[in-house]
Amino acid sequence: MPIRVAIVSPEQEVWSGDADMVVARTTDGDLGVLPGHVPLLGLLAPGGTVRVKTGGREISASVDGGFISVTHQGVSILAETAKLT
């Protein structure tokens, strides 16, 4: 069962879709999120990355500042700046 993911900045939605796993660099270290993860809110590390694994491929985005929100509905990456790499 995949998890719904959205990576957004104030200017645009950078990527959204279903994923098997999300890995984000937070101020506390790398955070891996699988479907069914407990809800949480984390602070993204400056100059960090977000990796989304979906269907055997990996999507990577560079992010700078912002938050990661994990709920039962999915994962939201709300970054000050974000772009696919």
UniProtKB/Swiss-Prot annotation:
Molecular function as annotated in GO: ATP binding; proton-transporting ATP synthase activity, rotational mechanism
KW Lyase (keyword) present: no
GO CC aspect terms: plasma membrane; proton-transporting ATP synthase complex
Subcellular location: Cell membrane
Keywords: ATP synthesis, Cell membrane, CF(1), Hydrogen ion transport, Ion transport, Membrane, Transport
Tagged with keyword Transport: yes
Highest taxon of the lineage: Bacteria
Pfam families, alphabetized: ATP-synt_DE_N (PF02823)
InterPro entries tied to this protein: ATP_synth_F1_dsu/esu (IPR001469), ATP_synth_F1_dsu/esu_N (IPR020546), ATPsynth_dsu/esu_N (IPR036771)
Function: Produces ATP from ADP in the presence of a proton gradient across the membrane.
Family: Belongs to the ATPase epsilon chain family.
HAMAP family: ATP_synth_epsil_bac
PANTHER family membership: ATP SYNTHASE DELTA/EPSILON CHAIN, ATP SYNTHASE EPSILON CHAIN, CHLOROPLASTIC
Assembly mode: F-type ATPases have 2 components, CF(1) - the catalytic core - and CF(0) - the membrane proton channel. CF(1) has five subunits: alpha(3), beta(3), gamma(1), delta(1), epsilon(1). CF(0) has three main subunits: a, b and c.
Protein's name in the database: ATP synthase epsilon chain
Lineage: Bacteria, Bacillati, Actinomycetota, Actinomycetes, Frankiales
Gene: atpC
